[in-house]
Amino acid sequence: MKKWKAAGLITVAGACVIAIVWGLHGRTKNNAKLLQLDEQVSDDSVIYVALGDSITYGYSLEHAENERFSARIAAYMKQQGMQVVECNQGVNGQLSDDMWQNIKKGKVDLLDHADYVTFCIGTNDALLPFEFFVMQYEDYFYGYSGAGDDSSLWKKINKKTFVRDFEEADRSAEDNLNRFCNNLSDSIDLIRKASPDCRIAIMTLYNPYRNMDYEISAGGITINIGQYAEEKISQANTIISTVCKEKNIVLADCYEAFASSNDIVLNNQNAENYIDPDDHPTAVGQQLIADVFIEALFTK
C-alpha cells in the first residue's frame, strides 16, 4: 500500500480557511467595483452575473479580472456585438447556502436586471468537510516526512477516533449535499422571479483530486482521496443535472471537459505528488470553463 502523501490536500484545506478570509476581502473589492458597474449600465446593456465560489472569483490567477472564465465569456459576448456589463459575484470559500442567502437578502447587485447568469457552485459543499478532516490528521498523513499508514507514528493514533471523525465528516458532506439541492433550486426560483427572461447556465464540477490514488486503512475501512472525491463530486453533479432538467436550465458539462483534457488545467497538476496546495484552475482551465459555457449558452 502506498503511503498517503496528503500534503497537497491538507494544504488545500488550510487554503480554504485562508480563502474564507480572502472572501471577505474580495467582497469589499467587489462592492467598490459594483458602484462602477452601476454607472456603466444603460438601456442597451446586457447584464451578465457570474455566481459562485473561488473558481468564479478567479482565485490564484495572476490577472483574475481578465483571466477568469466570466471575463472570457464577457469578452466573447462583446465580440458578438453585445454591450455587456460583467458582474462577477464569486466569493472565495462560498457554500451554496451562503450564495442562496445573499440572493435571498438582495445582496447580489444587478441580479434583478440580469440577462445571463452562470453558476459555479458546489465543490465546497461536497468536499470541504473531508478536507478539514484530513487537515485534522495532517501530522500522521505527511507521506513526504515519513509518516504514513505503516509508520510508527500512525500506529499510535486512536483508530476508533479516526474512523469516527471520518464518518462525521462524511455525514457533514451528505448534509451539505442535501441542502445543496434546495439551495440551487431556490436560488434559480428567486432569480427567475426577479428576471423572468434571464438565461441561466450551471456548470458540472470537476474532481480536483481525480488522479490522487493515495489511500489509508483503519478500523476496517479504506479511504482513497481520489475515489472519495469522485463519489462526492458525482453526487453534486447528479443534483446539478437534475435541477437543470426540472428547471429547464442550461447545463455546461465542465466535468467531462476537464476529465478529457490533456492540458494543464489545474495548478496541482504542475506539482509532483500534488505537493502544490492549489487545486484551482490555471488560466488554461479557466478558458476551458469559459469555452464550455459559451458553447452551452450561445451555440446550442
Labelled PLM ranges:
Residues 205-300:
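Catalytic His-Asp segment of secreted/periplasmic serine-dependent ester chemistry enzymes
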Residues 54-57, 91-96, 123-128, 206-210, ...:
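Solvent-exposed loop/turn segments at secondary-structure junctions
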Residues 98-175, 207-208:
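Oxyanion-hole/transition-state-stabilizing segment in secreted/luminal serine hydrolases
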Residues 26-92, 107-111:
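Serine-esterase "nucleophile elbow" of acetyl-processing enzymes
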Residues 32-43, 99-117, 186-197:
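Short amphipathic alpha-helices and their capping/turn segments at secondary-structure boundaries
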Residues 14-25:
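Hydrophobic alpha-helical membrane-insertion segments, chiefly the h-region
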Residues 1-14:
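N-terminal Sec-pathway targeting helices
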Residues 47-51, 85-90, 115-120, 199-204, ...:
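Structural recognition of the beta-strand scaffold that forms the well-ordered cores
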